[in-house]
């Protein structure tokens, strides 16, 4: 053991030891309790950033802690390798995305290993490998057979220059981020997965997720968006057709003054053929983003269609407007407008001088100026004919029943959740295994012809999908009639890859089936770690896919992740680290200067996992100083501990002196609190406990036999508490100080109940409520002994002097108050 702390050397030796001994490679073992710890897999950008390091350090602390507890721990790592970022990087560098991606993976794998994470690298997966996406294609075929994968027209953001669909974040001021072209709303044919078939179960099973953050549960509940409402039929004034409206407010039905339909509604398109003004308006609407949030905040605009509908109860004529705020994807693309009781309808009505008809007044009868603002709270019905004077809550059921009984409507449970559009007009993704034949139509690729390989030698240009230009890919023969046919050139949304990867880690070597029985052993994941930005999309899709895999008989649980931790961001100068802000700190530079253990220790100590972490250079220096202090202390006690650790009776040492028992009690109290905090995932306070223990031990001397044994016990506790957080130095010191074997094989320390037993109490002594002294008494001391000890305390006697004592109050285990 060197006298000076040399992190580069000891970390290299520890990592070589773990690799040579395959320390973290695990097998299924039914005799042991399993623990599956997983951090969200990264996109291989080529460089780890501090957000990665924090995420993976938190996961590694949890995994190593569970190893110490004797569990069979799986902690794998892989790469979310498909997607737009790799394609864009390849365009800029004029090289194939496959080459760029694999080069980055190699670089990032090395960086992860330098941090000493306890990953089972034998299970590594890369989503752009055909061995992985082959089974994704197989899964798509199963969904297609069950009617859960289907194709339909959908509205997208379309870049007319690059000839591709854009995500909302790729649009800047209404223009494509690369081409600068004005983005259009276009209806194109796309593939969808029928997640809506699982809406009710996805909502209901949120109640099972007792160890998920409440914020994530709420976000998913709102995204699924269950509502109870009524479908109401509005007949067109002319002809047999009708418009169906879904509403959660049938109590306001008598206040409808117009209907609004989406620009993509068939009726709007039909009217555009006969009106240039309407056609121009629809064209303008095409230049609006398709995101619901964008549509909600944009200026409300519309145009009169010239058509009328008939109110189902009053039989009044209602004008039908085409409005840019109505979503075709929501319900039927038709809204019944009640401007007196809906803020959006009110804003639109005032702009276009449409009538307001109040039908609910405040329950307390106070006047409301409906011209100034919509009244949206509960109240009493007015101007509603036979429904007058009914409270609005009761009116929901009364009017719903009336509509049903008169064939004008029906109750319906509605979900905000839409089916999952997985088509991407991109190259770098999983090919959708579908063939189009002029004779046979849409034909799924036979399973024995999987995988449909993505050509990896293509250099994309950014103008449309290169797969459409690659004849060797899209030209094929129909598997049914053997005539010339074409492949689907859309690729899958990369969220598909990340929706089932956690299960594939259980059997990445399996080439006969998608998942084998090992998946049932390891799933569900016991602890999942990742950012809250994935609360809705990724986590919801993974829950959906888990239920699909369960229904296919491949898994036997309802949910993919038992416990979820959403770590906070890493900030510097109050802002998230980013290259554009110039506030990035690279992990590699810190590892080179201080070592991986220092980086890990700072990351863990600086903030609780779920809170944002403010970067501090002085905090990193402090973590480094602590490890040097630990190393120096260990070097000083090395010879004494090696000698004690060779003694057979070392574990049965009895401490007699009160000061030694008190010191031991302090150590075990720190251990007790640290264990509570480990279970609560409050690792920063575990580090605080470790620092307290070291400060206690440093004051002891190895020249005293009792203290030397205290140092041995305390150091053994300290190193095991640190082992999940700073594994390299803990591994090295455990062996150098003669504790024997691999520290990971050492059981997690538990406090000794005897050490925690208090033999003496410190009580405060008051005179007329003012603090005048402190006394030490045996834990079981009688009231008489406590009174006597208090009255004989030197400072108390001085304050009493010749005063007459009226009463002595003893509050057990707390204080004595002498009244004079």
From Swiss-Prot:
It is found in: Cytoplasm. InterPro entries: aa-tRNA-synth_I_CS, aa-tRNA-synth_Ia, Leu-tRNA-ligase, Leu_tRNA-synth_edit, M/V/L/I-tRNA-synth_anticd-bd, Methionyl/Leucyl_tRNA_Synth, Rossmann-like_a/b/a_fold, tRNAsynth_Ia_anticodon-bd. It comes from the Bacteria. ATP binds at residue 579. Keywords: Aminoacyl-tRNA synthetase, ATP-binding, Cytoplasm, Ligase, Nucleotide-binding, Protein biosynthesis. A motif ('KMSKS' region) lies at residues 576-580. A motif ('HIGH' region) lies at residues 42-52. GO terms for molecular function: aminoacyl-tRNA deacylase activity; ATP binding; leucine-tRNA ligase activity. It holds the Pfam family tRNA-synt_1. It catalyses: tRNA(Leu) + L-leucine + ATP = L-leucyl-tRNA(Leu) + AMP + diphosphate. GO terms for biological process: leucyl-tRNA aminoacylation. PROSITE patterns: AA_TRNA_LIGASE_I (PS00178). It is an enzyme of class 6 (ligase). Its EC number is 6.1.1.4. One of its GO terms (cellular component) is cytosol. PANTHER family: LEUCINE--TRNA LIGASE, MITOCHONDRIAL, LEUCYL-TRNA SYNTHETASE. HAMAP family: Leu_tRNA_synth_B. Belongs to the class-I aminoacyl-tRNA synthetase family. This is Leucine--tRNA ligase. The lineage of its organism: Bacteria, Pseudomonadati, Pseudomonadota, Gammaproteobacteria, Legionellales.
């Amino acid at each position: 053991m060197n006298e000076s702390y040399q992190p580069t050397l000891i970390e290299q030796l520890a990592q070589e030891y773990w690799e040579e001994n395959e320390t973290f490679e695990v097998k299924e073992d039914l005799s042991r309790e399993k623990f599956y710890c997983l951090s969200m897999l990264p996109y291989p950008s080529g460089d780890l950033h501090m957000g990665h390091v924090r995420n993976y350090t938190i996961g590694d602390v949890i995994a190593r802690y569970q190893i110490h507890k004797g569990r069979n721990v799986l902690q794998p790592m892989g790469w979310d390798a498909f997607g737009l970022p790799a394609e864009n990087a390849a365009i800029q560098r004029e090289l194939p995305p496959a080459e760029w991606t694999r080069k980055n993976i190699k670089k990032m794998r090395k960086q992860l290993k330098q941090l000493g994470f306890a990953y089972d690298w034998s299970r590594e997966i890369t989503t752009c490998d055909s061995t992985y996406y082959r089974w994704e294609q197989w899964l798509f075929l199963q969904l297609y057979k069950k009617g859960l994968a289907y194709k339909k027209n959908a509205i997208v953001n379309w870049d007319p220059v690059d000839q591709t669909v854009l995500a909302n974040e790729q649009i800047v001021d209404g223009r494509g981020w690369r081409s600068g072209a004005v983005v259009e709303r276009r209806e194109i044919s796309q593939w969808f997965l029928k997640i809506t078939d699982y809406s009710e179960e996805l909502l209901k099973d949120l109640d099972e997720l007792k160890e998920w953050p409440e914020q994530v549960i709420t976000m998913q509940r709102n995204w699924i968006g269950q509502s109870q409402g009524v479908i109401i039929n509005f007949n067109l004034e002319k002809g047999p057709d009708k418009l169906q409206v879904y509403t959660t407010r049938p109590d306001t039905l008598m206040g409808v003054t117009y209907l609004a339909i989406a620009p993509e509604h068939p009726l709007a398109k039909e009217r555009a053929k006969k009106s240039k003004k309407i056609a121009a308006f629809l064209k303008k609407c095409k230049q609006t983003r398709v995101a619901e949030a964008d549509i909600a905040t944009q200026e409300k605009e519309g145009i009169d269609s010239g058509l009328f509908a008939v109110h189902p109860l009053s039989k009044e004529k209602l004008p039908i407007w085409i409005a840019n705020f109505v979503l075709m994807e929501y319900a039927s693309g038709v809204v019944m407008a009640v401007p007196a009781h809906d803020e959006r309808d009110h804003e639109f009505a005032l702009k276009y001088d449409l009538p307001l008809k109040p039908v609910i007044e405040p329950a307390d009868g106070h006047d409301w100026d409906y011209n100034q603002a919509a009244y949206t709270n509960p109240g009493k019905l007015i101007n509603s004919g036979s429904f007058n004077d009914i409270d609005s809550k009761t009116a929901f059921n009364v009017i719903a029943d009336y509509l049903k009984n008169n064939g004008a409507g029906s109750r319906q449970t509605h979900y905000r959740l839409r089916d999952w559009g997985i088509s991407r007009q991109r190259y770098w993704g999983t090919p959708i295994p579908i063939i189009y034949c002029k004779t046979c139509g849409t034909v799924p690729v036979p399973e024995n012809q999987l995988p449909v390989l993505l050509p990896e030698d293509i250099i994309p240009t950014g103008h449309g999908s290169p797969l459409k230009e690659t004849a060797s890919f899209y030209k094929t023969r129909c598997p049914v009639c053997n005539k010339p046919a074409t492949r689907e050139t859309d690729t899958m949304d990369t969220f598909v890859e990340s929706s089932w990867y956690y299960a594939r880690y259980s059997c990445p070597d399996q080439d006969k089936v998608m998942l084998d029985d090992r998946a049932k052993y390891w799933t569900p994941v016991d602890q999942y770690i990742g950012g809250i930005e994935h609360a809705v999309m990724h986590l919801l899709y993974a829950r959906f896919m888990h239920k699909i895999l369960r229904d296919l008989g491949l898994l036997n649980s309802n949910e993919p992740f038992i416990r979820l931790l959403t770590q906070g961001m890493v900030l510097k100068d109050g802002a998230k680290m980013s290259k554009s802000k110039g506030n990035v700190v690279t992990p590699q530079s810190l590892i080179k200067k201080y070592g991986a253990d220092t980086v890990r220790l700072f990351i863990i100590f600086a903030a609780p996992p779920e809170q944002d972490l403010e970067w501090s250079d002085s905090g990193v220096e402090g973590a480094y100083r602590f490890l040097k202090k630990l190393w120096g202390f260990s070097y000083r006690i090395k010879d004494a501990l090696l000698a004690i650790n060779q003694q057979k009776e070392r574990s049965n040492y009895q401490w007699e002196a009160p000061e030694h028992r008190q010191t031991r009690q302090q150590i075990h109290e720190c251990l007790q609190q640290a264990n509570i905090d480990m279970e609560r995932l409050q690792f920063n306070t575990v580090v605080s406990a470790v620092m307290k223990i070291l400060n206690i031990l440093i004051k002891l001397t190895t020249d005293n036999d009792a203290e030397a044994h205290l140092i041995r016990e305390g150091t053994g506790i300290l190193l095991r508490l640190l082992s999940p957080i700073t594994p390299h130095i803990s591994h090295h010191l455990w062996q150098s100080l003669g504790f024997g074997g691999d520290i990971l094989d050492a059981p997690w320390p538990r406090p000794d109940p005897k050490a925690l037993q208090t033999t003496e109490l410190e009580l405060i002594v008051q005179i007329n409520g003012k603090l005048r002294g402190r006394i030490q008494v045996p834990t079981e001391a009688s009231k008489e002994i406590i009174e006597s000890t208090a009255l004989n305390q030197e400072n108390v006697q001085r304050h009493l002097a010749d005063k007459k004592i009226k009463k002595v109050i003893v509050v057990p285990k707390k204080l004595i108050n002498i009244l004079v």
